[in-house]
Design a protein with these regions (language model features):
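Arg/Lys-rich, positively charged N-terminal/basic patches that mediate binding to nucleic acids
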Residues: 1-39
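Short, solvent-exposed coil/turn segments
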Residues: 2, 63-65, 73, 82
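Substrate-binding strand-loop-helix patch
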Residues: 42
Length: 104
């Protein structure tokens, strides 16, 4: 069943998206930066309708606290949590950096 939840991309995740876009701009130009930012935001918007499409976070401490991990594409993933009818996105990171710490 499709749900219609609220999606809140928290400031640390917004900063991550900005940093990712800046990185893409530095190596491939503005169109690449816009494309990756759009791809990430479009993927995150899927969580509004399908909040459990990500997996339980692979870090046991984060999993116990209800955090989930959603693979955006082959390079990036987000850490998020569903509280009632709201999806909170905490971080967007390079897949290999997704470790315990400050939710990244």
């Amino acid at each position: 069943m499709v749900q219609n939840n609220k999606l809140i991309i928290l400031q640390p995740a917004r900063d991550d998206i900005f940093d990712i876009a800046n990185y893409h701009q530095s190596i491939s130009g503005s169109s690449s930066a816009l494309a990756i930012a759009r791809e990430i935001k479009n993927a995150l918007s899927l969580l509004k309708e399908f909040p459990l499409m990500g997996t339980v976070h692979d870090d046991s401490l984060l999993a116990k606290q209800g955090y989930r991990k959603f693979r955006i594409n082959n390079s990036y993933a987000c850490t998020y949590k569903v509280i009632e009818n709201t999806v909170y996105v905490y971080t967007v990171t390079y897949n290999n950096k997704q470790k315990t710490g400050i939710l990244n």
